[in-house]
């Protein structure tokens, strides 16, 4: 499991949602 990759994608999505 590449949690770092997943967390990175999640971070990007959350950033877009926060805007």
UniProtKB/Swiss-Prot annotation:
GO terms for molecular function: toxin activity. Keywords: Antibiotic, Antimicrobial, Fungicide, G-protein coupled receptor impairing toxin, Immunity, Innate immunity, Mast cell degranulation, Secreted, Toxin. Expressed by the venom gland. GO terms for cellular component: extracellular region. It is found in: Secreted. Its main location: secreted. GO terms for biological process: defense response to bacterium; defense response to fungus; innate immune response; killing of cells of another organism. Mast cell degranulating peptide. May also display antibacterial and antifungal activities. Its mast cell degranulation activity may be related to the activation of G-protein coupled receptors in mast cells as well as interaction with other proteins located in cell endosomal membranes in the mast cells. Belongs to the MCD family. Bombolitin subfamily. This is Bombolitin-6. It comes from Bombus lapidarius. The lineage of its organism: Eukaryota, Metazoa, Ecdysozoa, Arthropoda, Hexapoda.
């Amino acid at each position: 499991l590449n949690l770092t990759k997943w967390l990175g994608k999640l971070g990007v999505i959350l950033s877009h949602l926060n805007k």
